[in-house]
């Protein structure tokens, strides 16, 4: 079938398999051009491996370090009449290219919050890999069913303590609008922490330790975003921030648990990028459009693969990791440079419907957004017939 983009709000409801494959190939080419990651990982588990930063972490491990990788995700395949999710096509493409290189690559499709998926993962590691030396935790989910109680929690994106008004960008209508977000209730904050905080990461590491499938010196990292003051009210100081602060607490216990193995656990701070998760945050499209404009002018613009490749080389496996006073690994330093943030702030209030394309890089934002779903990827002929029914060989279905 011929597949065209159909965007509804902050999601594109169609995806393009050939575009997703080309997108994955571009990321692989970027990593390979950088050469090997010195002393990089060899057997890697990526929890949340199908899109965005998790996919970039899997690509960097495999193609920067020659690592065998096991990926966990929750995606939907295509059929003859309907495309699957982008993460499905990304993972199929990743495995295809990894197998061509002679690398082990397998995937588990199911709910990573569940005990069943943890059990299947451990069985697969024992059978195929023995032990893993890196565990990347990169889940972004709107809800979580607690594996012990069955309780269902939903995450909320709201400020804490007070309602907040700010400028936003309606990406459908392409207009600047004022948005008001009401303050989260205590319950909403607690539920958001239950979904996006560190409990599940801790459960994963506990399960892997108990099963004795973590190698000596094993590392684990979970990804976070801090941002600067423009986004603080609704992000770092809001309900999502409460969950991210929970990661900062939980990592201390995880680090202690890994100490007997000579291992380490770190939260890694990455820059703001276009992902399916970030496009749902009301102020992010405007912030990202301005950030892209400023960072491209300065020659420092980066996407997921540049960020994660740099994180591996500089910090996770670098001789002098970039650590902050909280012990987090930092890859977001270019975004937070004072000259970048002050310029974004200066332009923030000047943007109007009339000068949107002039003052911001909304065009670049839109293009990167469509790239997520396999559209507007260089070198892909979108008039060609494609088969949306793409298989992932040896997929383990939970």
UniProtKB/Swiss-Prot annotation:
Q: Indicate the segments annotated as coiled coil, or none if absent.
A: none
Q: In the UniProt entry, which residues are flagged as the active site? A: 235
Q: Where does NAD(+) bind?
A: 48-53, 74-75, 111-112, 139-140, 244, 273-275
Gene for this protein?
fabV
Stated role = Involved in the final reduction of the elongation cycle of fatty acid synthesis (FAS II). Catalyzes the reduction of a carbon-carbon double bond in an enoyl moiety that is covalently linked to an acyl carrier protein (ACP).
Reactions that this protein is recorded to catalyse: a 2,3-saturated acyl-[ACP] + NAD(+) = a (2E)-enoyl-[ACP] + NADH + H(+)
Instruction: List UniProt keywords, sorted A-Z.
Output: Fatty acid biosynthesis, Fatty acid metabolism, Lipid biosynthesis, Lipid metabolism, NAD, Oxidoreductase
Question: An example of a Gene Ontology BP annotation on this entry?
Answer: fatty acid biosynthetic process
Q: Cell inner membrane as a keyword? A: no
E.C. numbers: 1.3.1.9
Q: What is this protein called?
A: Enoyl-[acyl-carrier-protein] reductase [NADH]
Molecular functions per Gene Ontology: enoyl-[acyl-carrier-protein] reductase (NADH) activity; NAD binding; trans-2-enoyl-CoA reductase (NADH) activity
As for family, the record states: Belongs to the TER reductase family.
A Pfam family per the record: Enoyl_reductase
């Amino acid at each position: 079938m011929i597949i065209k983009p159909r965007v509804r709000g902050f999601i594109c409801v169609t995806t393009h398999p050939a575009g997703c494959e080309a997108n994955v190939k571009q990321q692989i080419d970027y990593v390979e051009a950088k050469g090997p990651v010195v002393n990089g990982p060899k057997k890697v588990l990526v929890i949340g491996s199908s899109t965005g930063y998790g996919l970039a972490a899997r690509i960097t491990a495999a193609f920067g370090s020659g690592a065998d990788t096991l990926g966990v995700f929750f995606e939907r395949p295509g059929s003859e009449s309907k495309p699957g999710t982008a993460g499905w096509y990304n993972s199929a493409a990743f495995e295809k290219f990894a197998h061509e290189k002679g690398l082990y690559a397998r995937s588990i499709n199911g709910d990573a919050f569940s005990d069943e998926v943890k059990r299947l993962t451990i069985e697969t590691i024992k059978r195929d890999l023995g032990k893993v030396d890196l565990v990347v935790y990169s889940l972004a989910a709107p809800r979580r069913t607690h594996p012990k109680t069955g309780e269902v929690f939903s995450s909320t994106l709201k400020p804490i303590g007070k309602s907040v008004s700010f400028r936003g960008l309606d990406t459908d209508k392409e207009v600047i609008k004022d948005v008001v977000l009401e303050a989260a209730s205590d319950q909403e904050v607690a539920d958001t922490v239950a979904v996006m905080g560190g409990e599940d990461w801790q459960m994963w590491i506990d399960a892997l330790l108990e099963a004795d499938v973590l190698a000596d010196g094993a590392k684990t990292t979970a990804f976070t975003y801090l941002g600067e003051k423009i986004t603080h009210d609704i992000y770092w100081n809001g309900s999502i921030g409460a969950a991210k602060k929970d990661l900062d607490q939980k990592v201390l216990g995880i680090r202690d648990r890994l100490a007997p193995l000579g291992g380490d656990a770190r939260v890694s701070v990455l820059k703001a990028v276009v992902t399916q998760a970030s496009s749902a945050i009301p102020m992010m499209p405007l912030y990202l459009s301005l950030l892209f404009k400023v960072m491209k002018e300065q020659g420092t613009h980066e996407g997921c693969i540049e960020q994660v490749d740099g994180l591996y080389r500089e910090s996770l496996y670098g001789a002098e990791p970039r650590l902050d006073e909280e012990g987090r690994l930092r890859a977001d330093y270019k975004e937070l440079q004072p000259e970048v943030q002050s310029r974004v702030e200066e332009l923030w209030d000047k943007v109007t419907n009339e000068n949107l394309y002039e003052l911001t890089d909304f065009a670049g934002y839109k293009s990167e957004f469509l790239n997520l779903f396999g559209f507007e990827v260089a070198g892909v002929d979108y008039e060609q017939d494609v088969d949306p029914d793409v298989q992932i060989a040896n997929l383990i279905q939970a």
